C-alpha cells in the first residue's frame, strides 16, 4: 500500500512532528514522527556510513539553522538534516518502493465569474466579481456536475445519466453548495487549467469574502489553507493558495514542464484543438452576455472546458507521469515542478537503502551566472530557413553516466582564467579542457586545479595529464575530473531508471 498525500502537522517537541498521511485505503492517519539526522561518530558507535565513508549514527536532539544569527548553535558534523521532515518520513516508511497509489479521487474542474478587470494577482486576491458557475468531472465514478447561478429561475435541478445540473438562485447558495459538494467528493487531486494562478485562488478568496474564512478553509480536510496573502515567507512559485490535504495539479503548468516545447498560445481552446481536436464552445459577444441571454449554451461552455481537460489527460497522461515521478522522489504531487525535490528524494532513498547517509547540502553554494558548456537556447516559435535537428538521446543523463558524475566521485576541476572567458569585451564559452584538448596545449603551461574543498594548487599541464591517466579519471569538456573506480550514486540511479524506461517502452509497443 502506498501513500496518496502526506503533510507535516503541528510540532510536538524538538524535531518531533505530527504527520498527516493518506494511503490507498483512504483512511486519514495521524502519526508522530521524530525527525532524525545523523552525526559523525567513532567506528564502534556507527550504524551507517557517510557518502565519503564517514562513520555516523542517528541523533534526535540536534539543532540546525541557515540563519547566521542562530547558526552558532548548530550541532557540528550533521548529515541529512536539511530535508523537509515529511519527505524524510516518506523515505523512512516506503524506502525505495516507487509504486504509485492507485485509489486517488481526481476532480477536473473549472469556474466562471463575471467579467472585471485584468487578472492580476492583486485583482484575484480581491475577488470582486460573483462566481456564476462551477463545473467538475469526477474521474473515478465518471460523473459530471455543475452549479449554475440562476437568478431568473430558468432551470430545474436535473440529473440525466451521469450529468447533474444544480441551479442556485444566489451566489451565496452556489458557494455554500459547492463547499458541501467538495467535502462530499473529498478529492485527493484537483485538476484545472491555469488553476494555480486563477481558479483556486479566486474561488478561495471569493468564498472567504462572501461567506467566511472558516467556510473557505473547510475546503481542506484539515481545515488549513495557506495563502501568499497571509504568509510572510511564501516559497511556492506560481501557486498562491495551497489547500492542505488536496493536491493541486495545474494542467497548463504540467504541459509547460513535460511537453519540452513552446506553444504559440497556452489558451485552453488552442491546446485543446491541437491535442484533442476539441475546441471551446463558440458564442457571440462576451461571456457575461452569453450568461444573461443563453444560459443553456453557457452551461455547455463550462462543461466543455472540463471535457477538454479530461481528454488532454487521456491523451498526454501527465497525471500518471506526475505520480510516478513523485513516488520516486517521495514527495507530494504538487511539488513535481521542482526537479531537485524529486532528485533529492530518490537519491536519499537509494543511499539509505545501501546503509549510506546522504550528505548535507552546501550551506554556502557557489552561484555562477554562466557555466562553460552549459548554455541552453530557449526555443522560439516560428518558421526558419536552413535549420536541422540533431536529437541526442537523453543527452544530460548520458553525460552524467559516461563521466561518472557525482558528489562523491568529484576529484577537482581546472579553473578557467577570467581573461580566457572574455575576448574583445565579449563573454565566450569555448574553453575546452578535456584530456585531448590538454594534450594540444603547451605542456609547460600552468593551470590552477581546485579540489572539492575549494582549495587550489597550480600544476603544469603535463602533470595534470599524468594525474588523469595514472588514476583513470574521466574529464568533462570544461575540465571537471571524476573517479571511475566505482559508480557514482547518480550513475547508479540513472542506469536503473534507463533500464525501467526500456521495459516500459517495450510494454507500450506490446500494448
Regions found by a protein language model. Name each.
Residues 3-48, 52, 83, 89, ...:
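Conserved RNase H-like, two-metal-ion catalytic cores of nucleic-acid enzymes
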Residues 1-84, 209-210, 214-242, 277-282, ...:
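Non-catalytic nucleic-acid-binding interfaces of large nucleic-acid enzymes and RNP effectors
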Residues 92, 98-118, 213, 219, ...:
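Extended, Lys/Arg-enriched charged tracts that mediate electrostatic binding to polyanionic substrates
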Residues 392-511:
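Helical catalytic core of nucleic-acid polymerases
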Residues 116-119, 144-146, 200-201, 257-259, ...:
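Short helix/loop capping segments that flank catalytic or ligand/cofactor-binding pockets
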Residues 184-199, 203, 246-343:
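Acidic, Mg2+-coordinating catalytic module of metal-dependent nucleases/exonucleases
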Residues 288-420, 424-427, 508-511:
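Common nucleic-acid-contacting/processivity interface regions adjacent to the catalytic cores
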Residues 152-263:
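Conserved DEDDh/DEDDy metal-dependent 3′-5′ exonuclease domain
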Amino acid at each position: 500500500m502506498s501513500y496518496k498525500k502526506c503533510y507535516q502537522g503541528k510540532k510536538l517537541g524538538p524535531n518531533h512532528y505530527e504527520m498527516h498521511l493518506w494511503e490507498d485505503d483512504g483512511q486519514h492517519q495521524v502519526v508522530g514522527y521524530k525527525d532524525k539526522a545523523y552525526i559523525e561518530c567513532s567506528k564502534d558507535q556507527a550504524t551507517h556510513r557517510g557518502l565519503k565513508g564517514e562513520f555516523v549514527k542517528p541523533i534526535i536532539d540536534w539543532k540546525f539553522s541557515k540563519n547566521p544569527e542562530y547558526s552558532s548553535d548548530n550541532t557540528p558534523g550533521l548529515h541529512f538534516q536539511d530535508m523537509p521532515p515529511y519527505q524524510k518520513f516518506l523515505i523512512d516508511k516506503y524506502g525505495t518502493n516507487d509504486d504509485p497509489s492507485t485509489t486517488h479521487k481526481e476532480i477536473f474542474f473549472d469556474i466562471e465569474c463575471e467579467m472585471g478587470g485584468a487578472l492580476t494577482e492583486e485583482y484575484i486576491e480581491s475577488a470582486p466579481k460573483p462566481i456564476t458557475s462551477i463545473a467538475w468531472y469526477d474521474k473515478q465514478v465518471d460523473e459530471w456536475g455543475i452549479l449554475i447561478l440562476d437568478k431568473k429561475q430558468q432551470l430545474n435541478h436535473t440529473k440525466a445519466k451521469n450529468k447533474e445540473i444544480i441551479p442556485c438562485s444566489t451566489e451565496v447558495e452556489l458557494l455554500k453548495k459547492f463547499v458541501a459538494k467538495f467535502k462530499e467528493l473529498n478529492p485527493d487531486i484537483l485538476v484545472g487549467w491555469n488553476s494555480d494562478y486563477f481558479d483556486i485562488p479566486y474561488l478561495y478568496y471569493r468564498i472567504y469574502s462572501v461567506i467566511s474564512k472558516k467556510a473557505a478553509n473547510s475546503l481542506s480536510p484539515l481545515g488549513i489553507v495557506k495563502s501568499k496573502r497571509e504568509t510572510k515567507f511564501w516559497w511556492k512559485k506560481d501557486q498562491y493558495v495551497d489547500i492542505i490535504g488536496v493536491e493541486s495539479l495545474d494542467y497548463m503548468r504540467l504541459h509547460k514542464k513535460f511537453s519540452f516545447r513552446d506553444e504559440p498560445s497556452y489558451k485552453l481552446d488552442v491546446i485543446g484543438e491541437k491535442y484533442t481536436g476539441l475546441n471551446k464552445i463558440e458564442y457571440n459577444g462576451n461571456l457575461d452576455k452569453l450568461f444573461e441571454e443563453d444560459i443553456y449554451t453557457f452551461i455547455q461552455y463550462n462543461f466543455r472546458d472540463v471535457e477538454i481537460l479530461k481528454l488532454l489527460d487521456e491523451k498526454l497522461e501527465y497525471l500518471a507521469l506526475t505520480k510516478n515521478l513523485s513516488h520516486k522522489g517521495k514527495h507530494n504531487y504538487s511539488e513535481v515542478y521542482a526537479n531537485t525535490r524529486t532528485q533529492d528524494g530518490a537519491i536519499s532513498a537509494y543511499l539509505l537503502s545501501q546503509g549510506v547517509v546522504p550528505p548535507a547540502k552546501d550551506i554556502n553554494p557557489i552561484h555562477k551566472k554562466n557555466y562553460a558548456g552549459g548554455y541552453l537556447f530557449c526555443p522560439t516559435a516560428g518558421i526558419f530557413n536552413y535549420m536541422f535537428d540533431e536529437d541526442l538521446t537523453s543527452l544530460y543523463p548520458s553525460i552524467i553516466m559516461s563521466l561518472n558524475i557525482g558528489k562523491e566521485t568529484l576529484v577537482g576541476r581546472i579553473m578557467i582564467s577570467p581573461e580566457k572567458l572574455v575576448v574583445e569585451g565579449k563573454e565566450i564559452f569555448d574553453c575546452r579542457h578535456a584530456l585531448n584538448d590538454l594534450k594540444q596545449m603547451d605542456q609547460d603551461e600552468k593551470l590552477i586545479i581546485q579540489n572539492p574543498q575549494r582549495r587550489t594548487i597550480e600544476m603544469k599541464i603535463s602533470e595534470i595529464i599524468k594525474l588523469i591517466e595514472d588514476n583513470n579519471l574521466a574529464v568533462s569538456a570544461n575540465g571537471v575530473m571524476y573517479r571511475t573506480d566505482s559508480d557514482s550514486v547518480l550513475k547508479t540511479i540513472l542506469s536503473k531508471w534507463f533500464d525501467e524506461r526500456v521495459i516500459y517502452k517495450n510494454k507500450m509497443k506490446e500494448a
